[in-house]
Amino acid sequence: MRLALSGRHHRALLDHLFPGDGNEAVAFALCGRARRSDLDLLVVSEVVPIPHEACRVRTPHHVSWPGTALEPILQKAAAAGLAVIKIHSHPGGYPWFSDTDDIAEAEMFPSVFGWLDTDAPMASLIMLPDGKLVGRSVREDGSGEPLSCIRVAGDDFLYWHSQAAEAATVPEHARRIAQSFGDGTVQLLRQLRIGVVGCSGTGSIVVEQLARNCIGELVLVDSDHVEHKNLNRIVNSTADDADAERPKTEVLQRAIAAMGLGTKVTAFNRDLMSVEVLQALSTCDVLFGCMDSIDGRHLLNKLASAYLVPLIDVGVRLDADGAGGIDSIWTVVNTVLPGGSSLLSRGVYDMAALEAASLRRTSQAAYDEQLKASYIKGIKVDRPAVISVNMQAAAAAVDEFLARIHPYRVMPNKTFAIRRFCLTDPDANENKEEGSACSVMSRSLGTGDQMPFLGMPNLGD
């Protein structure tokens, strides 16, 4: 079992569980679920602290609370079909469950399962003074095992894998990476599952970099095939691929296999608007959005919010003057964190543009009719594209990812929520911090699996 929480959840837990008095404290969390054939994932929807003054006992080695404090939490979980997890602190830094913890949980969790009338596993976690989390699953019969991974989608991307997953040697092809970022970061990279949506101009270059940085698994999504017009910017594509109309995902999968660096690839030559594709992306540790479509960006942002996955969106805009000149060249990297601002609230697109893009997808005839009547604004389909510009954007995106898992900048990562680069006017370059939470995306925060999927009827179950 794995667990995901947002950076805001993590900060709230750290503030509550370590108030400065040296005593243990406790909180609970309501969680959505993602149940797949190969894993169970809990995603934190809401953190519910137990007030310090409500606890019966708080010492450096023990905390207890009245059962009445848990009742409203269980009521809410039962009504919404959510899981319940317990999180308490170990101020002394002991990194696993004590005998006292074992006894307390053996008494508490049977009532949790009984109240919620489910046999689906729950979890219990310990937070250490440095903010690290360790935990274990809890089944109805009291058995369980260490959580295989706990991840935090915050300004820094945090991942804690179980001890069994950490013991591995650095292969020869990764030694230069280890010299730059350390053995620990290389081991982390080899355990991550990263989704890349869009495998064309920027996406193919993002994939190339991730594979050569020894990512454990890549989930590639693109419904299109290689055409001759793509050969100027899709790395590893050939004229033979264009003649054969090979799927872009197949071309990149072939290239990664030829590298022989151990990266597993799951490729979908399908549209993002597919439950199977979205389910595969929902259990990724990071998502890269490398597409132009507005409705695709919106859907990926919503998925990232529902399953608490950090999203790095890559954008390129090259405006030609039509006479062989260039008006402006921009590249933009947006790092979108669950529970924070979104591509929508940052103005990457607006609701009118989203509605137009959705209409174009579902009914080209209706789109053309409304466009002709000036009810909607047209969507640009083809833009100028130059591989060197795409490379700069893709490199900035992957560097942003590396900085988030291994902070190396003088300024904190929160400073770089938005990075804009203007090649035609470098003085216009800017970095922006995270903004206010997006009211639209916050509705889906930590919801996990729903019926219909993501609460969208057009996606079905």
Name each model feature, range by range.
Residues 269-271:
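Conserved acidic residues
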